[in-house]
From Swiss-Prot:
It holds the Pfam family MGS. It comes from Geotalea daltonii (strain DSM 22248 / JCM 15807 / FRC-32). One of its GO terms (molecular function) is phosphoribosylaminoimidazolecarboxamide formyltransferase activity. This is Bifunctional purine biosynthesis protein PurH. GO terms for cellular component: cytosol.
C-alpha cells in the first residue's frame, strides 16, 4: 500500500472535484492538471502544476495533444517494484504519478442532440483521457485511478485510515471499473460512427456493442438446472422492472422478472382510469378498468381466477389499502407492482412476507423508443420495440360498431398486443372475459377464450373480440358469432379478407381493421 504523492486530475464532469482535490492537497499530494480543470482548481485556491510544465512540452493542435507524452505514461506505467523500470524512469527524468482522476468528453450527450454534426461528434471523442485511464488501470498495483465522482469519498476515507495510501484491493476494483467505462465509451462511438459508414445514416450499424451491468445473481434461471443473473442497462430513463424499488418480499426470480416486465409494460397502455393487469407466464390472464383500483382488481381477477393464482399483479396508480387487502385476503400472488405504494398498503402486504412488493415510479404517457433483442443460437435479432398501437382504423362491415363497442374494441386491442400469438381476447365493459393465448391456430385461440369465459361464469354474449393478426379463414368469425361476439377488431391483410368480412356481415357483426399487426413470440 503506497502513499499517494502526485495526482493528475482532468475531468469533464466536475462534480465534487474541488472538494476532493482540497482533501488530496491536505495529504500533501501534488496536483497536475490541464485546461478548464486546472483553472477551476486554481480559482478554488489550490496549487496546480500544468501538465505541460510537468512534461516540458506544450499543449498543441487545439488541445488534441495534452497528456500523450512519455513523462505522463511512463509515470503511470512504470512499476515501482521493478528495478529496471525505476532505473529507466530515473534516466529519462520520469517522475511517478500515483493517482489519475479523469472522466471523458461527453460523446453520448453530444450525439444525443438532434442537430449533432459529424464534426461535433468527432471533436467529442476523447483520446488522451482513455489512454491515461487505461495506463493507470493496467498498473493498478501502483496507481489509483478514478473515473466516477461517486468513488471520491470511498478513496478519501481509505486515505484517512491509512495515512494517505490506497489499498491494492481498492485499486484493482477501480481499475476494473475503468475498463468497463472505456469499453462502454468506445462502444458508443463505434455504434454511432458505424451507422454512418455509407450514404446517410443506417438504422442499424455494421457492428453493435452494448454494455449491461450485473444487478442480481439468481438461485437459478427459467428452470432449476439453469444458472442465471439479471443485468441492467446504463441510465434507464423510464419506469421499468430494471429501475423498480423492491419494498419487501423474497428475491425476484428469473421468471418473476420476465413476468413483471410483461405486466408493467401492459398496464402502461391504460391511462383512462384505474386499471389492473394480472399476468401468468408472461400472458395477461385478466385486465380491467374500474372505478378505483379495488374495482379494477376485482374485475381483472374474475376473468380467470384459476390462472391468477401465483400471478403477477400490476396497477397504474398508487396501491391503496383496499386493493392491497383484497389481494392478500383472496389469493396467492408472486409480485405486486405499482407506481407508488401507500404506507397502509405496505403494512397490509407485509403480513405476507414472501410477496414481492415493487414500486416503479410513474411512467410517461408515451414510452421512449428502444431496441428489442432476442438471442438465437449464434446471433442476435434486433428490432424496434413495438410501441405503436394501430394504424388507420377502418370499419369494413356493413354495420358500424356502436360507441360502446368501439370503446371495448380499443380496450381489447391493447390487451391483445401483449398476449402471446396467436392471440384472441374477448372483452366487455372495460374488462377481459376470455383470453386465448399461444395457439398454433387462431380459431383454437378463439375457442379457448370462450372456454375460459364459460369456466369463469362470464357472459360472452354482447362482448367484442380482438385478434393480434388477421383471420386466415372465416372459421374464427363463425366461432365467435356462435358464442355471442358482436364486434371484431383485427389488422386485416389476409388473402381472404373479403370472405372474413362477408362472414361478419352474415352474422350482423361490426368489424374494424387496424392496419397494424401485433405478433408476440
Amino acid at each position: 500500500m503506497a502513499k499517494i504523492s502526485r495526482a493528475l486530475i482532468s475531468v469533464s464532469d466536475k462534480t465534487g472535484i474541488v472538494d476532493f482535490s482540497k482533501e488530496l492537497a491536505g495529504y500533501g499530494v501534488e496536483i497536475l492538471s490541464t485546461g478548464g480543470t486546472a483553472k477551476l482548481l486554481r480559482e478554488a485556491g489550490l496549487a496546480v502544476k500544468d501538465v505541460s510544465e510537468f512534461t516540458g512540452f506544450p499543449e498543441m493542435l487545439d488541445g488534441r495533444v495534452k497528456t500523450l507524452h512519455p513523462k505522463v505514461h511512463g509515470g503511470l506505467l512504470g512499476m515501482r517494484g521493478n528495478s529496471e523500470h525505476v532505473a529507466t524512469m530515473k534516466a529519462h527524468g520520469i517522475e511517478p504519478i500515483d493517482m489519475v482522476v479523469v472522466n471523458l468528453y461527453p460523446f453520448e450527450a453530444t450525439v444525443a442532440k438532434p442537430d449533432c454534426s459529424l464534426e461535433d461528434a468527432i471533436e467529442n471523442i476523447d483520446i488522451g483521457g482513455p489512454t491515461m485511464l487505461r495506463s493507470a488501470a493496467k498498473n493498478n498495483a501502483d496507481v489509483t485511478v478514478l473515473v466516477d465522482h461517486n468513488d471520491y469519498r470511498k478513496v478519501l476515507d481509505e486515505m484517512k485510515q491509512s495515512g494517505g495510501a490506497v489499498s491494492s484491493a481498492t485499486n484493482f476494483g477501480l481499475a476494473v471499473k475503468v475498463y468497463q467505462h472505456t469499453a462502454a465509451y468506445d462502444g458508443a462511438i463505434s455504434n454511432w460512427l458505424g451507422a454512418r459508414t455509407g450514404e446517410g445514416v443506417a438504422e442499424y450499424p455494421d457492428t453493435l456493442t452494448f454494455q449491461f451491468k450485473k444487478a442480481q445473481g439468481m438461485r437459478y434461471g427459467e428452470n432449476p438446472h439453469q444458472s442465471a443473473a439479471f443485468y441492467v442497462e446504463r441510465d434507464v430513463k423510464e419506469a421499468s422492472i430494471a429501475t423498480a424499488l423492491q419494498l419487501q418480499g423474497k428475491e425476484l426470480s428469473y421468471n418473476n422478472i420476465g413476468d413483471t416486465d410483461a405486466a408493467l409494460e401492459c398496464i402502461k397502455q391504460f391511462n383512462e382510469g384505474p386499471a389492473c393487469v394480472i399476468v401468468k407466464h408472461a400472458n395477461p390472464c385478466g385486465v380491467a378498468i374500474g372505478a378505483n383500483l379495488l374495482d379494477a382488481y376485482d374485475r381483472a381477477y374474475k376473468t380467470d381466477p384459476e390462472s391468477a393464482f401465483g400471478g403477477i399483479i400490476a396497477f397504474n396508480g398508487e396501491l391503496d389499502e383496499a386493493a392491497a387487502k383484497a389481494i392478500v385476503d383472496r389469493q396467492f400472488v408472486e409480485v405486486i407492482i405499482a407506481p407508488k405504494v401507500s404506507a397502509k398498503a405496505s403494512e397490509i402486504v407485509a403480513a405476507k412476507k414472501n410477496v414481492r412488493l415493487l414500486q416503479c415510479g410513474q411512467w410517461q404517457a408515451e414510452s421512449l423508443a428502444r431496441l428489442d433483442m432476442k438471442r438465437v443460437n449464434g446471433g442476435l435479432l434486433v428490432q424496434q420495440t413495438d410501441l405503436s398501437l394501430h394504424g388507420e382504423l377502418k370499419v369494413v362491415t356493413k354495420r358500424q360498431p356502436t360507441e360502446k363497442e368501439m370503446i371495448d374494441l380499443l380496450f381489447t386491442w391493447r390487451v391483445a398486443k401483449f398476449v402471446k400469438s396467436n392471440a384472441i381476447v374477448y372483452g366487455k365493459d372495460g374488462m377481459t372475459i376470455g383470453v386465448g393465448a399461444g395457439q398454433m391456430s387462431r380459431v383454437n385461440s378463439a375457442r379457448i377464450a370462450a372456454i375460459k369465459a364459460e369456466h369463469a361464469g362470464l357472459q360472452v354474449a354482447g362482448a367484442v373480440m380482438a385478434s393480434d393478426a388477421f383471420f386466415p379463414f372465416r372459421d374464427g368469425i363463425d366461432n365467435a358469432a356462435q358464442v355471442g361476439i358482436t364486434a371484431v377488431i383485427q389488422p386485416g391483410g389476409s388473402m381472404r379478407d373479403e370472405e372474413v368480412i362477408a362472414a361478419a356481415d352474415e352474422h350482423g357483426m361490426a368489424m374494424v381493421f387496424t392496419s397494424m399487426r401485433h405478433f408476440r413470440h
